């Protein structure tokens, strides 16, 4: 996906990028490739691939979730900033918080945020299980995102505690998510959520399947969740 295709593809979805925003994406790409030589951020480094599989893929969440109505977003396990930072570039009013367990990545994100001239971004080096118990962050966010970092049953325990009541948890998944959704239903219900919609679409050009799962927070998460670090992954809430 070249820059013209990227711009036109977003335009079709009602997202018009300014020259400044296009510069931000260009800087993002340059920093990603440069820092990737020092640390493992991504296996995808070819420009057309980055624009398609990282930038466009991240922004695709906004085709189904109205981020214009959101104010606060938390991204769990964002790695090199996906999906939250491409979303932030497109919707600059958002206050974005990223939590990641690797301090090197947090250092990269802090530097990147400055280079992109982003405002209202915060980066935390922490485990999601610990972060979700913090009074400052628990049930504080309009929307929480996660992109393919774990199974849905595990992700729900890491993410739903951070979502405020009536807010959304948005999980971005690659191939068919049917099995994950089925095994994740118990965890979602236990943690106060309910699946609102599942959007399946084809990523342009390469036509690979993507799924965006939108979960609404209906009630408070019980105080015992999330459990201690590592437990959600070892013993997911599955029925």
UniProtKB/Swiss-Prot annotation:
CDD domains: AdoMet_MTases (cd02440)
Chain residues that bind S-adenosyl-L-methionine: 77, 82, 128-129, 147
GO MF annotation, one: rRNA (guanine-N7-)-methyltransferase activity
Location in the cell: Cytoplasm
Pfam families, per the entry: GidB
E.C. code: 2.1.1.-
InterPro entries: rRNA_ssu_MeTfrase_G (IPR003682), SAM-dependent_MTases_sf (IPR029063)
Transmembrane segments: none
Domain of life the protein comes from: Bacteria
UniProt KW keywords: Cytoplasm, Methyltransferase, rRNA processing, S-adenosyl-L-methionine, Transferase
Keyword Repeat: no
Single GO cellular component term: cytosol
Principal cellular location given in the protein's record: cytoplasm
Residues forming coiled coils: none
Region Disordered, annotated ranges: 216-239
SUPFAM superfamilies: S-adenosyl-L-methionine-dependent methyltransferases
Purpose: Specifically methylates the N7 position of guanine in position 535 of 16S rRNA.
UniProt family annotation: Belongs to the methyltransferase superfamily. RNA methyltransferase RsmG family.
Xref: PANTHER family: S-ADENOSYL-L-METHIONINE-DEPENDENT METHYLTRANSFERASES SUPERFAMILY PROTEIN
Record protein name field: Ribosomal RNA small subunit methyltransferase G
Lineage summary: Bacteria, Bacillati, Bacillota, Bacilli, Bacillales
Gene name per UniProt: rsmG
